[in-house]
């Protein structure tokens, strides 16, 4: 049977200056300089080295494999002086059989390179390309005859559930072997009861009454257990979870899950954290999911690369519909075609069994700085065909750059299309969002359209009673999103909408909002400690969990004698009290606005059913200068 030995402790890191530092994994060398602005974070080759004792194994009957779950971006692995493997691509799992190279004591050297080059994606994008070994490293001890480990980093087991017209479900299980043996397949329900079983490397089992994976309300999962037997003895086992669901997209009616309308409203997510970069823990993944669920989202765009398998597992468990993509982004590389193929193959093979995933993202904003348009289009057609060949059960999509017009041929290659539009932020005029959507839908009524990115920068420390585009205030960000939510309500045919972004994230080329190196469009701050007002706006729109929230709490000092106080809630009635006296009670939806006299300091209490929130404001003679963005002379305000 399999045994896993983690290699996470006691590494030596040889950095850019040649200095050696003791580190544990996960680790990145850009945790600080990749987040402080200047577009000068160090990109190059660093070395990780560790010593380990060979795990206990039978040389005649077992093998030892080395597994990396994420190393950015190009990797050369050397064991005891012998090159084991190389890998280009910073976000996927890869493995190597090291059985014949093992000694009693071993030296493992990993050369990691995130330098600028012309063939490995990403090379240009609005996020930091952290270098390092930032996910788990393990030794896998397996029988010499085992369920395959050497196939694109996947599990060796491919499960395809199909919901039939008679409401039964066919579960096809294909097992790839390295060696010989008898394959036995068991399907268990959530309580551990066996509901189907079969024998063979390619089998189909039928569920008479399948319990569906039904989004956030009921994300039911079966477990498929594949055993490899020899002489009546189980020598290897792989388990994978299975969700039975159907989905489709109607250009005129939106997304459907299991035959019913299921509007997709959610967020995009980058994986990095303040002071840590992409070297994060499972507990941090859990925290991200908890915050996304609190918001009431039902879909996540996992941008702009393959995320940790653990997070896809969480999406399965909590019913999040996922857009998964490769980092074919911003700039087409004429020498990068094979890398797009490799990364797409790894993405699909490694994530095929996740019921949460409904579409494969081919590219993002690829027209920003692409010169060879013919080669770029050919690359897209090739990737689109590859996705359909590898996985005919899912759809393909891409995210178009704002300046990529509706008539651009790249927007008509994939099954679905979405746009990254920031009308009302980078471009004046929130009303343009409605005009743009109406125009596209008029010209292409049979083309499914979504918004893959939309947002505005919002700093919790910046405030204004008269928020304007570009002021980076918490109030303008909220005002922007209020409009966008109403806009989407006017266009219910959209197949999906994804806020950019759930969390602030590092983009070292940026200098905006008074904090260089960051993109502040998140609904939650980079450290996950502060939920901006916009977070509560979406919670009011999407969540069933009763709450009430007074906005602009951090905007304490006011110069006006009467202030407008905004309250977000998903309750129908909100009452506002000032110093214990009821000012007013309103009935409405999502957004409630009150006028409050201000003379000195006032303590407010908002009440919605059993929910209560409080805030304090005070009148001052002069504006608090800390609320206003100090303009800089930086020429690198944006990343492009």
Q: Where in the sequence are the language-model features?
A:
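Secreted/periplasmic carbohydrate-active enzymes, especially glycoside hydrolases
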Residues: 1-306, 312-314, 318-322, 343-346, ...
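Substrate-binding/catalytic cleft of secreted carbohydrate-active enzymes
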Residues: 172-174, 289-292, 299-541, 545-564, ...
